[in-house]
Regions:
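Short beta-strand segments at enzyme active-site cores
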Residues: 50-57, 157
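Active-site-adjacent betaalpha module
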Residues: 1-4, 40-48, 65, 72-207
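N-terminal nucleotide-binding beta1-loop-alpha1 segment
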Residues: 6-11
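A basic- and aromatic-enriched beta-loop-alpha substructure that forms the phosphate/nucleotide-
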Residues: 56-70
């Protein structure tokens, strides 16, 4: 099988205290740890030559693409949260993202819906996905379910994910694991699988 790492929405707007999502009262418990572990996974994948695909949840100016199901009744729109081209919408610096990276922008929870993610992965010959990111029980779970329904083998890197509360994170992980949508693992597990003994050295390198 050929694998790829899919990093879901690890953006300033979700993961930084001054981001738009925390500012409307939906901050993520354990975001800092999740970002750190996602960085470990990204470094391991890059070192192993495994494709890394980043997704970004964002909206165009004017937000015509946001649709009627607004975050918190429009609070996010009210502060221009996750607006394309802003700091809020960008991938956090810790992951070493650059414009040259494979990046899929989306405006719905499921990263496969109305995006180029599936043809991109098919074009890379990928049939195994390692998934991490935020929010565990929302965009990550929606994407994992969609991947499963498209016949990808999915591994969830649970310690590189975060949700609004630990309970919601744990519930999302439990559903994905117990329903068979994903095998549950950690960022360190990914490093070991891809790099063997070199995984420890990669994990120790600063982002």
């Amino acid at each position: 099988m050929t694998g790829a790492l899919v990093v879901v929405d690890v953006q300033n707007g979700f993961c930084r205290p001054e981001g738009s999502v925390p500012r409307i009262g939906m901050g993520l418990a354990g975001a800092e740890a999740a970002v750190g572990n996602a960085a470990v996974a990204v470094r391991a994948a890059r070192e192993a030559g495994t494709p890394v695909v980043f997704t970004r949840h964002l909206y165009r100016p004017g937000r015509a693409d946001e649709g009627p199901n607004l975050y918190r009744g429009g609070e996010l729109a009210g502060i221009d949260g996750l607006l394309a081209g802003t700091w809020d919408a960008e991938v956090v610096d810790d992951l070493g993202w650059t414009p040259a990276d494979l990046t899929v922008d989306k405006c719905r929870f499921d990263a496969f819906l109305w995006t180029s993610l599936d043809p991109l992965l098919r074009g890379l010959g990928v049939d195994q996905l390692y998934v991490c990111g935020v929010v565990t029980n929302i965009c990550v779970e929606s994407t994992v379910r969609a991947a499963y329904m498209r016949d990808y083998r999915v591994t969830l890197l649970a310690d590189a994910c975060a949700a609004q509360t630990p309970r919601l994170h744990e519930a999302g992980v439990e559903v994905m694991g117990e329903c068979g949508f994903a095998t549950i693992a950690s960022a360190a597990d990914l490093g070991s699988a891809l790099l063997g003994d070199r995984a420890v050295d990669v994990a120790a390198v600063p982002a």
